[in-house]
């Protein structure tokens, strides 16, 4: 009987915490993240919200005189309209979360925070991305990025 009660309580707690959704603020970033290697070249979205459609291309470049500042350019193709975003790094919270202020080609502004959980600089990255729009609640999602375009979306290279 004690086992049944314990399993039931565990199941209820599991469902309760799973229902809350993703929360990037509680994620632990990888300790040896090398931003100069990650923020270089092109990344493709392999798994995340909307991965089957639209195609998402992420280009990361570095610039700046002291250290470096990341500039993120994202091509986003949805409903046959191509929207581009440019994000400028504004902060590096606790050395773990990279914060950006972003503006789209259609003048939408938002803030994006990236927590890098696991990265193989030549192949893949597991990232927790938090986006905050001024008039909407914060949205946290886990993304799997890859260096080479997979065959899941043939249009991805065209928008990069």
Swiss-Prot record:
InterPro entries: Calycin, Triabi/Procalin. Its main location: secreted. Changing residue 157 to N: In clones TR12, TR28 and TR45. Expressed in salivary glands. Keywords: Blood coagulation cascade inhibiting toxin, Disulfide bond, Hemostasis impairing toxin, Platelet aggregation inhibiting toxin, Protease inhibitor, Secreted, Serine protease inhibitor, Signal, Toxin, Vasoactive. Changing residue 104 to G: In clones TR12, TR28 and TR45. One of its GO terms (biological process) is symbiont-mediated perturbation of host defenses. Residues 1-18 form the signal peptide. Changing residue 145 to F: In clones TR12, TR28 and TR45. It is found in: Secreted. GO terms for molecular function: serine-type endopeptidase inhibitor activity; toxin activity. GO terms for cellular component: extracellular region. Disulfide bonds join 24-128, 57-160, 87-102. Changing residue 26 to L: In clones TR12, TR28 and TR45. The keyword Protein transport does not apply. Belongs to the calycin superfamily. Triabin family. The sequence shown is that of clone TR5. Thrombin inhibitor. Forms a non-covalent complex with thrombin at a molar ratio of 1:1. Inhibits thrombin-induced platelet aggregation. Prolongs thrombin clotting time and activated partial thromboplastin time. It only minimally suppresses the amidolytic activity of thrombin. Inhibits thrombin-mediated fibrin formation in the host. Inhibits thrombin-induced endothelium-dependent relaxant and contractile responses in host blood vessels. Inhibits thrombin-induced mitogenesis in host vascular smooth muscle cells. This is Triabin. It comes from Meccus pallidipennis (Triatomine bug). The lineage of its organism: Eukaryota, Metazoa, Ecdysozoa, Arthropoda, Hexapoda.
């Amino acid at each position: 009987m004690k086992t049944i009660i314990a399993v039931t309580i565990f199941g209820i707690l599991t469902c309760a915490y799973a229902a809350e959704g993703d929360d990037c603020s509680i994620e632990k970033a990888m300790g040896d993240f090398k931003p100069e290697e990650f923020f270089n070249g092109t990344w493709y979205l392999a798994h995340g919200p909307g991965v089957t459609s639209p195609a998402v291309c992420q280009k990361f470049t570095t610039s700046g005189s002291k250290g470096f500042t990341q500039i993120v350019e994202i091509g986003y193709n949805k409903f046959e309209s191509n929207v581009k975003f440019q994000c400028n790094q504004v902060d590096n919270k606790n050395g773990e979360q990279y914060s950006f202020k972003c503006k789209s080609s259609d003048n939408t502004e938002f803030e994006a925070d990236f927590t890098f959980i696991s990265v193989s600089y030549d192949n893949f990255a597991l990232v927790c991305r938090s986006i905050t729009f001024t008039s909407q609640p914060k949205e946290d999602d886990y993304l799997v990025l890859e260096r080479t375009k997979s065959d899941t979306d043939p249009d991805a290279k065209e928008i990069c």
